[in-house]
Amino acid sequence: MPDIHLHREKGGYLFEDHAFGVNLEITRKGFFGGLSAEMLNNRKLYAGGDAPSGWECTAFERITDRPLESLCHSRFIILRDGGSMKQTSEVIATEAGKTYEARAWVKPLTDTAEIAFGLAGREQTFTVTANGEAYIPLFFTFEGTDLDGGTFTLTVKGEAAVFEVSLRDADHFYGMRRDVIEALRAVCPTAIRFPGGCAADHFDWKESLKAPEFRVPADGSSKWFLFRDSYDQDTLDIGLNEFIMLCRELNAEPEYTVSLILSDGEDARRLVEYCNGDPTTEYGAKRQALGFDPFDIHLWYVGNEAYFFGGEFQNSQAAALRTNELIRAMKQADPTIATAIGLTWGYGYRDWCFDFMKYIDTPFEYVSYHDYIGILPDASQGDNGMATTEILEDNFRDGDCFGLNFYRDMLFKESFAPIRVCVDEWNYSWGKDSSNALFFSNALQLHFIAKGKETYHIDRAEFFMPVNEGMLTVKGSSVKTESTAHLFTLMQSHRGGTVIPCDSDHPDLDLLCTDHGDHLFLSVVNRKSTPLDMTTEGYEITDCTEIRTGAYSFESNDFEVVENTAPTVHGHSVLFMKLAK
């Protein structure tokens, strides 16, 4: 029976609250099909060739060369007499007892046109008359029924241009699903990073200040992985202001990524002034006129993975000079902000990092570090460079991280003392569904982050990402809380404590202990498949909870949260114990 040795007398360091940040990137199913209340894919009809992607259309013409006619400056369609458009999707889901709203923005091209739209069998009909206006908004509400995989239709008698459509729960929160927000609330994120990630290079913050129906869709077709679940486009239904409202609702600190590609110094200065400026400033006044007090965003990421996707800023000198320009301009708007510069540990980009740092001449507060254990999301057992389940069992076994070793021992060898690291993206892999193996990897990774302050100067961390990539699985009208979400929730009991040394005489137990004065809190990860009973040398166990998983694989996702009566941790599972002397 393994003994746990707790070295309270040796002291330690404060467990950082900021280990529990998350990313909310506009990508894949994180927003559309996840956080967003919108149920219609490609609702502004931007994506597609001869027909708009995701829509079955009859008697129509797709207009691609007259974007200024559309209120959102997108592509649109003209439906001839008897023409129709239809979309069927698992995202179209309603529940009995809830109210929903359907909208369409149209322009009759005959003297009158009859427009019928809504859920199949629940459509309402409007007769619209040409009046010289650029568009006519149509709107109605209806009571839901229990429906999964629904169909939305729009048909025309006469002729009309259709610019955009919408279907969502009427009780949305700034365009977001309240049930997903409540599930996020239970995770207790301390900070939220937005809009990416790679999406930052496709997000026009000024565009996102318009009313949602006027926002030009974002084109992500240059990155196959970015908007892959929404036909390489995003309709920008959730913008900067909505993001801040979410942070306030969740009592989470907002963090923002400024694009090296989209922002020069003046644009970045205006952005910071809009977010943090006094109402007497030009852009602070614009924010105040929209009804928002200062956002007080403290941490700003300057660029994201420019070495991979930076276009002209894949050149390290150009990236450094633009970074200097942005930081100087941003701190002109608000000298109190903190900035994080974008670096990498990747073997093929280490010369890039050395060259980049040669040209950085502006003070910064953090260096960014992205930590994915696997490489591609669609492989699991060693293919395409993915870490195997066997390799995962030995991750961080000695508290060592070769990527951060590069930062400490090479890149900043002579100047690491003041460096603070922000692990602003971490997970087993981006774009991957929850599984028992992913949970196990996340548990070891979160332990490492919590214990890495002294060795690697880790001050902050942001999980990538909670919605549909490991924590919360959203399908139709349901939201499932996954094992990693429970891990985050239970690990919160370490907050406010002092991390103290602890060890075991069993090599397969990974331990983290915090001292809270009147009690200790201990989390234990079992690296192997054999259940292990433990003793805690004279401490009374007052609470004992386990996240117990089933088969250890990327294909299995069975787990339970169990109140244990004894200190036993099962294979590839995590045990949490509150201890009293």
Show the residue positions of the predicted features.
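Noncatalytic carbohydrate-binding groove/subsite architecture in carbohydrate-active enzymes
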Residues: G149-E159, S316-S441
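Carbohydrate-binding surface patches
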Residues: P507-Y539, H572-K578
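C-terminal beta-strand-rich structural cap/linker in extracellular carbohydrate-active enzymes
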Residues: D558-K581
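An active-site-proximal structural segment forming one wall of the substrate-binding cleft
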Residues: D169-P189, L236, F243, S263-V302, ...
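The substrate-binding groove and active-site-proximal loops of carbohydrate-active enzymes
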Residues: S166-Y174, G220-L236, P254-L262, V302-A320, ...
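Active-site groove signature of glycoside hydrolases
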Residues: T155-G158, P195-G196, T281-N315, D371-I373, ...
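Aromatic/acidic polysaccharide-binding cleft in carbohydrate-active enzymes
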Residues: H18, I26-T27, I419-L511
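Extracellular and organelle-lumenal recognition/adhesion modules and their flexible linkers in secreted
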Residues: M1-C198, H202-T235, E253, R269, ...
